[in-house]
């Protein structure tokens, strides 16, 4: 398994634009006397006004116009430099792109789009792309890719993508384990030297990989109610927290709601790989509550998790609302504290808080808020929130949220970037999005 660290000159054009072009700057050819459109271009993906790291891969895009015959795009840095792409779509030279962004880190890129339709050129309003002053030093991202489905699925896998180009490689695909479902992959603070994920199915197991040494753990044992599902590493690498979940899926019979995924039992525990021992505590394995989604604080002294009162299924499924709780943890002894505290009470707001993820600088906890339940990816109302651990105030991340599902997320190593999932594109497919957060908490 090869897992990587996660998470010039002008473009030479293939041909002249013809007599209807002029040279606005040395080496940059643009149409003469184009029709001026008092609107922004409709492009896909929509990169208008986005903020990007200087190392991001070229933001190539299509113009959403079936009558478009050719596209001419000029990108000019606010500090220095420019580049151009001309053809069926905007397809920037990768070396020129990286050079331009490196020159304009902390500045802006002005993008001018010309579109040819029926032999006539139209120039749209310029838009900006902001180049963040914060570096994204992580190599890339890992993710699971699976087509939207319900009970039956085909090929799926866990993949890694280099964010500075378009290189994608498979970490593991279910073709290696037919009929298996791969999920819940987690590295230790973005370091793939320590990695774990769970395989569901008849031959299911949990993989714990440390510095090239792999250990496959039995999916269930007498001490647990179910498999080792949602993991999170202790920063020391000596422990890994898991939840064990008895999960079910049902179909809705109402408009605009498809699936409900819920737990009928769940507990939290810690696994210590070196002596191959489970660390169990009755405070995290209660009969009248569901405990799930454990995560360690960056200093390793606290274990955060989500907890809801157990409710009857199916009659009480909308009453399952999770709060974010914490308990102390002593890495020297491997023992928990003697008290559980609630740090964010979502139930009081009539909501459910899941997927807590502390920033690695210890300042924030990002989490997903939905109306109820523990699986917000199917909840259109789900948004990501930010809990400030200094002020103890929580707020929705309005700048990054959308009118559709916004859910699972994770931080970059320096805590200035995060990747999250959203269905804002079409309401069906979950795609990955990047966002930046500055020193003042502005997203």
Predicted region positions:
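Hydrophobic beta-strand positions that form the internal "hydrophobic ladder"
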Residues: 194-195, 237-240, 300-303, 365, ...
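C-terminal motif of bacterial Sec signal peptides marking the signal peptidase cleavage site
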Residues: 18-21
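Conserved, compact domain cores that house catalytic/ligand-binding motifs in diverse enzymes
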Residues: 140-224, 230-231
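Low-complexity, Pro/Ser/Thr- and charge-rich linker/hinge segments at domain boundaries
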Residues: 43, 121-150, 223-224
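Residue-level detector of Asp-centered blade-edge/turn motifs that repeat once per structural unit
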Residues: 189-191, 235-236, 298-299, 360-361, ...
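Short, conserved, GDST-rich strand-edge loop motifs in beta-rich repeat architectures
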Residues: 138-152, 242-264, 305-322, 367-381, ...
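Multi-bladed beta-propeller domains
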Residues: 32-46, 79-96, 164-181, 209-227, ...
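Contiguous beta-strand segments within globular domains
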Residues: 44-67
């Amino acid at each position: 398994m090869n897992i990587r660290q996660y998470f010039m000159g002008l473009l030479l054009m293939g041909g002249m634009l013809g007599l209807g072009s002029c040279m606005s700057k040395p080496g940059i050819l643009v149409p003469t006397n184009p029709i001026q459109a008092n609107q922004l271009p409709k492009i896909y993906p929509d990169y208008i006004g986005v903020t990007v790291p200087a190392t991001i891969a070229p933001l190539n895009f299509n113009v959403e116009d079936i009558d478009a015959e050719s596209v001419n795009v000029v990108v000019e840095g606010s500090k220095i430099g420019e580049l151009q792409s001309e053809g069926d779509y905007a397809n920037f030279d990768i070396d020129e792109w990286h050079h331009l962004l490196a020159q304009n880190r902390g500045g802006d890129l002005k993008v001018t789009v010309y579109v040819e339709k029926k032999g006539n050129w139209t120039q749209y309003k310029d838009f900006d792309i902001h180049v963040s002053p914060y570096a994204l030093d992580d190599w890339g991202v890992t993710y699971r890719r699976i087509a939207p489905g319900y009970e039956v699925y085909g090929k799926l896998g866990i993949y890694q993508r280099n964010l500075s180009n378009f290189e994608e490689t498979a970490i593991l695909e279910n073709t290696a384990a037919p009929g298996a479902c791969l999920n819940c992959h987690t590295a230790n603070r973005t370091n793939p030297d320590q990695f774990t994920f769970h395989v569901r199915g008849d031959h299911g197991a949990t993989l714990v990989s440390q510095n090239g040494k792999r250990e496959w753990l039995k999916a269930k044992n007498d001490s647990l109610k179910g498999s080792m599902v949602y993991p999170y590493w202790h920063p020391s690498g000596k422990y890994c927290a898991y939840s064990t979940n008895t999960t079910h899926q049902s179909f809705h019979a109402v408009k605009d709601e498809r699936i409900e995924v819920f737990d009928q039992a769940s507990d939290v525990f810690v696994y210590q790989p070196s002596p191959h021992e489970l660390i169990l505590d009755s405070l995290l394995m209660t009969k009248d509550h569901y405990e799930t989604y454990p995560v360690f604080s960056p200093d390793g002294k606290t274990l955060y998790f989500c907890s809801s009162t157990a409710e009857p299924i199916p009659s009480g499924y909308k009453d399952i609302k999770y709060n974010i709780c914490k308990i102390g943890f002593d890495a020297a002894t491997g023992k928990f504290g003697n008290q559980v505290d609630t740090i964010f009470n979502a139930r009081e707001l009539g909501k459910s808080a899941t997927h807590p993820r502390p920033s690695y600088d210890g300042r924030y906890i990002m989490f997903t808020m939905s109306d109820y339940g523990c699986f917000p990816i199917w909840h259109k109302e789900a948004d990501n929130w930010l809990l400030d651990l200094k002020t103890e105030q929580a707020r929705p991340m309005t700048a990054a949220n959308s009118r559709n599902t916004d859910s699972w997320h994770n931080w970059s190593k320096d805590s200035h970037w995060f990747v999250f999932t959203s269905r804002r594109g079409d309401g069906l497919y979950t795609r990955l999005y990047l966002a930046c957060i500055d020193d003042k908490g502005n997203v």
